[in-house]
């Protein structure tokens, strides 16, 4: 009986990832051009509905190649299955995010995701509007000076370019949270 229950949970999660993956191309992909110094940058606007403060999305496919862009929100991209690359604006930095690792970005940090493989790449994204993040989560992270700097820097520097690459997430806590969020959001 327990195995059947676990199987149903996994089916529900698999169905949620399928739904979010199918919805991904139809999100509000609104890129606006902004002048930054002597160059023009693409800025992705909020991908969710106007009344949403936090949203979950998922890319599922064998190949992803995004245009280099910035975004007006915090994001956490979790490599649920497979690996992908992220090209960061910071020092023309490239980082590979392996399965069970996270790439966390600030508002307006420039980046582009890319990857391809024989099997599907699944990236689950959690997007959080800046205002809600500052109002809700800031107190929680205030004890860690580095994290506090990472999340506060965009309030001072509109075009901050920091990212966090979380590796060695062996305990599964983030994976479990991302799975729950994907299932509930779908």
Task: Go through each PLM region and give its residues.
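Amphipathic alpha-helical segments enriched in hydrophobic/aromatic residues interleaved with Lys/Arg
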Residues: 11-19, 23, 143-186
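Glutamate identity and glutamate-enriched acidic tracts
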Residues: 9, 18, 33, 41, ...
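Generic, low-specificity signal for short hydrophobic/alpha-helical stretches with a mild N-terminal bias
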Residues: 38-41, 48, 58, 82, ...
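N-terminal regulatory/effector-sensing and dimerization cores
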Residues: 51-149
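N-terminal low-complexity or simple alpha-helical regulatory segments
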Residues: 1-60
């Amino acid at each position: 009986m327990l195995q059947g229950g676990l199987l149903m949970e996994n089916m529900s999660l698999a169905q949620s990832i399928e739904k979010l993956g199918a919805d991904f191309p139809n999100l509000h992909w609104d890129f606006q051009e902004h002048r930054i110094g002597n160059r023009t940058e693409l800025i992705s606007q909020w991908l969710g509905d106007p009344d949403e403060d936090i949203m979950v999305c998922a890319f599922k496919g064998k190949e992803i190649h995004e245009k280099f862009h910035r975004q007006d929100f915090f994001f956490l991209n979790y490599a649920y299955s497979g690996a992908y690359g992220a090209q960061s604006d910071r020092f023309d930095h490239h980082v590979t995010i392996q399965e069970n690792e996270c790439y966390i970005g600030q508002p307006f940090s420039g980046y582009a995701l890319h990857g391809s493989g024989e099997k599907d790449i699944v990236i689950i994204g959690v997007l959080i509007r800046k205002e809600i993040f500052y109002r809700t989560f800031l107190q929680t992270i205030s004890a860690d000076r580095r994290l506090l700097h990472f999340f506060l820097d965009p309030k001072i520097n509109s075009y901050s370019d920091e990212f966090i690459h979380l590796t060695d997430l062996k305990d599964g806590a983030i994976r479990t949270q991302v799975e729950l969020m994907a299932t509930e959001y779908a």
